[in-house]
Amino acid sequence: MECPDPQPILELLEAPCPTIGQPRPEVGLRAGAGRVDIARVDGASAIVACVASSPLQLLAPSPRGRCAWIISASHGGGLLAGDEVSLEVDVGAGAVALLSTQAGTKIYRSRGEVASQGLSARVGAGALLAALPHPVSCFSGARFRQEQRFELARGASLLWLDALVAGRIARGERWAFDEYRSRIEVAIDGRTVLADALRLVPGEGPPIVARLPGVELLATVVALGPAVASAARELLERVAASPAERDAGVLAAASPLRDGLLLRVASRSVEAGLAFLRQRLAFVEAVTGADPFARTP
């Protein structure tokens, strides 16, 4: 039996592997880093670059359409002490992007090291970025820091949600972590228009449980720009028309921003708080064409 000429096989093996426009995750990235670029291509929003390095994972259930949808995840569903995760997002002019998470982010117990997470996003003129992750849950003894900065061109829009759960409530944990710090900055045309921070550290003032009696979830929403201005006005009016009651299950307060609002929510149960947010943010599907609270697009 004659053996076939091995040369064509060798040429095939030596040929570069075809790709789908996504470079190898480990090339040029430190551990936990990622980058996503979204652009307007032939009338649709499309992911034109997407790369990540473990423990960060990036999924693209809807890479092209009215809205490009990116889901971030991590191995094990959370961050260990010492993990540093950072993501850069660029949304080109006229594009629409939805950034969410696969599930809630768990922050595991630490013996001193801090788990950190960063997001840096640029949003072009006429573009919209909706950053709507599931809540963060800090376990007993956890240490977590988060920095997020959004740079918007004139005429760009942003919808941002940040939520924090008291901990593993079913196990009796309530605000038992060792450190939680979160900061957001938003700039429009190079000028900072919003800087907001939340710092919860035991030992700094009264116990956290005493400061947040009965509260299981805290959330902040920022809506800015022409794409969400109308919905923001309606939400502002709706919150203003609902006077806060001392024993209410969900408390909400809203402050007007130019072309938007800042909404704060405190809930006595995680379920009630999430239901409130889903209801108040139902307009997202109309402006993006995607449901951020659905399991799949």
From Swiss-Prot:
Entry-linked Pfam families: UreD (PF01774)
Subcellular location as annotated: Cytoplasm
Source organism superkingdom: Bacteria
GO MF annotations in UniProt: nickel cation binding
Key word Lipid metabolism present: no
One of the record's GO cellular component terms: cytoplasm
Keywords of the record: Chaperone, Cytoplasm, Nickel insertion
Subunit structure: UreD, UreF and UreG form a complex that acts as a GTP-hydrolysis-dependent molecular chaperone, activating the urease apoprotein by helping to assemble the nickel containing metallocenter of UreC. The UreE protein probably delivers the nickel.
UniProt family annotation: Belongs to the UreD family.
Described function: Required for maturation of urease via the functional incorporation of the urease nickel metallocenter.
Protein name per the record: Urease accessory protein UreD
Taxonomic lineage from the root: Bacteria, Pseudomonadati, Myxococcota, Myxococcia, Myxococcales
